Regions:
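Alpha-helical transmembrane segments and their immediate juxtamembrane cytosolic regions
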Residues: 1-325
Length: 325
């Protein structure tokens, strides 16, 4: 499921004009639901910080440093270096107009949500309060008109997805597992049709909620529609991932490699995509042609990361959130 999600992240960052609203309705929410599903409280806050340091923060800081190194070296004298570094340390997409964590905002946002969950996600009551406070803060920010691109406001927007994922793994696990087994043994054609119909519905409904920008904490014109489409789109991807399990066979090891390397793909996919995308921009100038062209470019980018992630895992596992040895 993470592989499907990262594909839509890659494709979405090509900004296909006909598919943009459709993709942005669910391509980021699905990752927060998955993250919530996989989360659990550590025995202590110290243990949480230690785990987060290796699995999230070290890859985050290294990738941000690699991406911003040219800016940091060339702008020491005019102060932009320090503004960018401060933005990276505090989770700003940009800080005072200077590039900071940019596409790595998701990782810092995830760290903040995990920390909030570790501190206040102990029981149903605290989870409800955490979710309600996040929603209130999110609505207040959207109504304020501020435009900051900060991981804290992004975390407020994403927290309901994260909590929903956690509940699927815990309190809702029994019906969730039953549905999983039911889909696995049911007709592939039936559930393919269900996923397709849901995607078609999202495609036509998503434009009714313009302005969705999760990296800016923006839910668009209608918050209820934002959360509804995020859940429905994630459910559709989940169906497709279950069906894919039945036909993947020996290719599953490559999917596992891609799934384990989402941090690296998130950080560097545009560096791989840009040179491949140039012919598409040059020759396919129409909207339909550009959408189709970038769809296949996104597949090529994903495939290119299979050997790249093998090299990273072998020689620089810290980028994958792993310790050596």
């Amino acid at each position: 499921m993470k592989v499907l999600g990262i594909f839509f992240i890659i494709w979405g960052h090509s900004f296909p004009p006909l598919m943009r609203d459709f993709i942005y309705a669910f391509n980021v929410p699905v990752f927060f639901i998955i993250s919530g599903y996989l989360t659990h409280s550590e025995p202590s806050f110290k243990a949480f910080l230690k785990k987060s340091w290796f699995t999230l923060l070290i890859p985050y800081f290294i990738i941000c440093a690699i991406k911003r190194m040219d800016l940091w070296i060339s702008h020491v004298g005019d102060g932009k270096t320090w503004l960018s570094m401060f933005g990276v340390l505090t989770g700003f997409h940009k800080f005072q107009g200077i590039h900071a964590c940019t596409m790595m905002w998701f990782i810092f946002t995830l760290f903040l949500m995990k920390m909030a969950f570790q501190l206040w996600g102990k029981n149903n009551r605290s989870l409800l309060i955490l979710t309600l406070c996040s929603l209130i803060g999110c609505v207040a920010f959207n109504q304020s008109g501020y435009d900051v691109g900060w991981s804290l406001t992004d975390a407020l927007l994403a927290m309901p997805f994260y909590v929903a994922g956690y509940l699927l793994a815990t309190q809702w696990s029994e019906p969730f597992d039953w549905l999983y087994q039911y889909i696995k043994r049911s007709s592939v054609w039936l559930w393919s049709g269900v996923a397709l119909l849901l995607f078609i519905a999202i495609y036509f409904v998503a434009p009714l909620n313009p302005g969705v920008e999760m990296f800016k904490g923006r839910y668009g014109a209608h918050p209820w529609l934002f959360y509804l489409l995020g859940v429905v789109g994630s459910f559709s991807l989940w169906i497709i991932s279950i069906l894919a399990e039945r036909v993947s066979g020996t290719h599953v090891k490559y999917l596992t490699r891609l799934s384990a390397g989402t941090i690296v793909i998130l950080g560097f996919h545009r560096d791989v995509a840009n040179p491949i995308e140039q012919p598409v921009k040059h020759y396919l100038t129409g909207t339909v042609g550009y959408d189709i062209g970038t769809f296949f470019v996104s597949i090529l980018v994903l495939l290119a990361f299979i050997p790249l992630l093998w090299l990273v895992k072998r020689y620089f596992p810290l980028l994958l959130g792993r310790r050596r040895g």
